[in-house]
Regions:
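Classical Sec-dependent N-terminal signal peptides that target proteins to the secretory pathway
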Residues: 1-20
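Transmembrane beta-barrel domains of bacterial outer-membrane proteins
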Residues: 20-329
Length: 329
């Protein structure tokens, strides 16, 4: 991971360094492309090696050629906005560098540079599925006639390792999608996550989606979350509307209600189990250069119990650079 940092710095600064030289624009772009390609291949090779090692295929596929994979979810609005749902369920390998500016009326402004890595364990998942299937077959009774006629539900699963700001984690997600008809779909999901800093945490999500058109999606989401060494249970109710726009851009509106069953921000006051934060946000995101450079603008307002539910206006700005097998629109 640390080998990538100098290359990242080179990628960002090379434009300014070459702007004062006599190098042509085409050469500058080629330098960007070459640097991005080297980092992306490095990220993918690490992910593939880890997956091969955990699945027992490290020596079999050590010299496996890199393949161009077409992901069925790469044109979805979840993929474009990089929602938590997409990041938990995608099979893509990527490293994201985010330059973030967060300005709020109630607190001081925050500017950060974040690194996030996602390495899917697709081959390891396949080995686990074969293992569980063999166990199931060994325990199958002779009464197969009823079993064949019974309607079964097959759960999907995703396993991955990753890092958020150099904090590694392991993640497992189990989910199933129901098509309800009339362009409605329902998906319950359960996620387990373990990291060195946050220890064990788990999240339950319920998504109810309505595809209004090819470029519009309405979503209702209910979530709950618990974390080791943290009191109470977090919960969230959200309504979101997504639109695809021309010129590789998209827009969304979100209304969220957050709470905790044992919320406490003042030691002299009892815990509070109701809604502690109401938030409305607007997001505009655009792919501005190549297939891996995005920006996002997100103004909004929230009403938090900490501020006696007085409005806290905020404006966030992101610059996202992706490496690896990333979202392509």
């Amino acid at each position: 991971m640390f080998k990538i940092i100098p290359a990242l710095f080179l990628l960002i600064s090379s434009t300014f360094l070459y702007a004062e030289s006599n190098v042509s624009t085409e050469q500058e772009i080629q330098i960007f492309d070459d640097t991005h390609r080297v980092i992306s291949e490095y990220v993918y090779d690490i992910s593939n090696s880890v997956d091969n090692l955990l699945s027992g295929e490290f020596f079999k596929e050590k010299n496996e050629a890199r393949k161009n994979v077409n992901y069925k979810d790469e044109d979805s609005l979840d993929a474009f906005f990089q929602t938590d749902k997409f990041k938990s369920e995608t099979s893509q390998t990527y490293l994201r560098m985010r330059i973030e500016s967060n300005n709020q009326s109630k607190t001081s402004d925050k500017n950060k540079i974040k690194l996030r890595a996602h390495l899917p364990l697709s081959k390891t998942k396949h080995v686990l599925k074969l293992f569980l299937k063999s166990k199931k077959d060994n325990n199958t009774t002779k009464n197969d006639s009823n079993t064949k006629n019974a309607k079964t539900i097959e759960f999907n699963s995703k396993y991955s390792i990753g890092a958020s700001s150099f904090k590694p984690y392991l993640k497992a997600r189990y989910f199933i999608a129901y098509e309800l008809g009339n362009n409605w779909s329902f998906e319950p999901a359960q996620t387990f996550r373990y990291s060195y800093n946050d220890k064990f945490e788990e999240t339950t999500d319920f998504y109810l989606d309505k595809k209004l058109s090819k470029v519009q999606l309405l979503r209702f989401q209910v979530s709950r979350h618990t974390k080791q060494h943290h009191s109470g249970m977090d919960y969230n109710f959200a309504t979101q509307m997504f639109w695809k726009l021309p010129k590789k851009s998209a827009f969304s509106v979100s209304q969220n209600f957050w709470g905790n069953t044992k919320y406490k921000y003042d030691l002299n006051k009892p815990t509070y189990g109701g809604i502690s934060d109401y938030a409305t946000s607007f997001n505009f995101r655009q792919n501005v250069w190549k297939k891996w450079f995005f920006y996002e603008i997100s103004p909004g307002v929230n009403f938090h119990r900490m501020y006696n539910y007085k409005p806290n206006y905020n404006a966030r700005f992101f610059l996202d650079i992706y490496f690896g097998r990333t979202y392509i629109r």
